[in-house]
């Protein structure tokens, strides 16, 4: 029988809980993307969504104003587009 030191055991617990929390975070992001924002999962690769989706998912407390999130996303997409157009001129 192998003895597991306390440090090893706590590292194993951290790895297990870390992977489950990552799965929960991904699930929240997908739910926010499709349920609240009404977007296709393929849009998750957009640079603006890559930045704001984790923030949106953390703010999502269940009872949210979908319109407010959508308007904020449209504003961010417009700013991104404006910055990329002026940067290339």
UniProtKB/Swiss-Prot annotation:
Q: Which residues form a coiled coil?
A: none
Taxonomy of origin reads: Viruses, Duplodnaviria, Heunggongvirae, Peploviricota, Herviviricetes
Q: Which gene encodes it?
A: SCP
Q: Which UniProt keywords apply?
A: Capsid protein, Host nucleus, Virion
What domain of life does the UniProt record list for this protein's source?
A: Viruses
Q: Does the keyword Transport apply?
A: no
Please name the HAMAP family in this protein's record: HSV_SCP_betahv
**Mind telling me what this protein is named?**
Small capsomere-interacting protein
Q: Subunit notes for this chain? A: Interacts with the major capsid protein/MCP.
